[in-house]
């Protein structure tokens, strides 16, 4: 019985020790998206056009990691790397929705910031003009959505894929 207790405690210690050392448990799944497409998803030019419309500006070039693409639609910017993988997006007008997996209809630029209260955004910085920068999901994931707000209204949302 004594050996069984030692074995049990050893197994528990092996399972718990990494979390104690690194100060965190396993990462929770975070599904940040723009119009249902999550960063890290491969998207072709034609798929982009069918989802977001024809871009006002499109640039592509070869890099050491494959094809890189930049799309601009209105004031919104999208970057794909490694042959079409969505890495970054910046939403600066109300054409597109983010976080559609978290809420019906998602969230748009121009929406009340209070719609995100249930996600417990963290204040990053307040600016002299009265605007503020918040971050979502920073405490539970490497993926984070940065939200800029003024007078309780969302001004823009930015996602950068963690490298």
Language-model regions: role of each:
Residues 1-9:
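Bacterial N-terminal signal peptides that target proteins for export
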Residues 10-19:
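Bacterial N-terminal signal peptides
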């Amino acid at each position: 019985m004594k050996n069984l207790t030692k074995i049990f405690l050893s197994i528990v210690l092996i399972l718990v020790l990494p979390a104690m050392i690194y100060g965190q448990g396993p990462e929770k799944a975070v599904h940040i998206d723009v119009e249902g497409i999550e960063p890290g998803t491969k998207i072709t030019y034609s798929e982009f056009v069918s989802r977001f419309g024809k871009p006002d500006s499109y640039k592509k070039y070869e890099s050491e990691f494959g094809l890189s693409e930049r799309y601009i639609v209105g004031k919104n910017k999208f970057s794909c790397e490694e042959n079409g993988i969505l890495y970054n997006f910046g939403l600066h007008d109300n054409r597109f929705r983010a976080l559609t997996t978290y809420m019906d209809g998602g969230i748009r630029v121009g929406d009340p910031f209070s719609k995100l209260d249930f996600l417990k955004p963290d204040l990053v910085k307040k600016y002299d003009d009265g605007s503020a920068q918040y971050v979502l999901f920073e405490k539970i994931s490497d993926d984070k959505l940065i939200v800029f707000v003024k007078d309780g209204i969302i001004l823009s949302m930015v996602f950068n894929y963690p490298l």
